[in-house]
Regions:
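Charged, low-complexity intrinsically disordered regions
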Residues: 2-141
Length: 141
């Protein structure tokens, strides 16, 4: 039993290979791990944590983004949320911010929609890593 399952969290894991091609010629290939969790109790947070990119910077001109006050986090992670107060409270913890930044910085995405959490992590992960466990533990308190 995994550490997350021991906390009462339902875990689904899948693996995908993403390829890019130009004019029918494969130019790159990368593997990703897709995780889906159902938390043991309902939470109200709705947020997506993704890589800060040019498009996100344009969106920030028109819509305020949560800033954690941690320059490394704020420059790496774009936070989209419908629950800004709850999301800001989650980001008060330095270890949670650091874990999110590492996962997203490596090419991952985290989506939280109430008791449902979806992560896509770069690479092949057969077990939960410390950053995933820290993040989910922070969600359930």
């Amino acid at each position: 039993m995994s550490e997350l399952e021991a906390m009462g969290i339902s875990v689904q894991r899948g693996f995908v290979t993403n390829t890019a091609d130009v004019d029918g010629v494969q130019t790159s290939e990368s593997e990703a791990t897709q995780l889906a969790f159902t938390l043991p109790k309902p939470i109200e947070i709705q947020a997506t944590f993704s890589k800060e990119g040019f498009g996100n910077k344009l969106v920030k001109i028109f819509k305020k983004e949560i800033q954690a006050g941690d320059p490394a986090f704020d420059e790496t992670v774009y936070v989209k949320t419908d629950t800004p107060e709850l999301t800001a409270a989650l980001l008060e913890k330095a270890d949670v911010r650091a874990g999110i930044a590492r996962l997203v910085g490596a090419g991952g995405v985290i989506e939280v929609d109430g008791p449902f959490v979806r992560m896509e992590l770069a690479g092949h992960h057969e077990t939960e890593d410390a950053d995933t466990v820290t993040f989910v533990r922070a969600l359930i308190g």
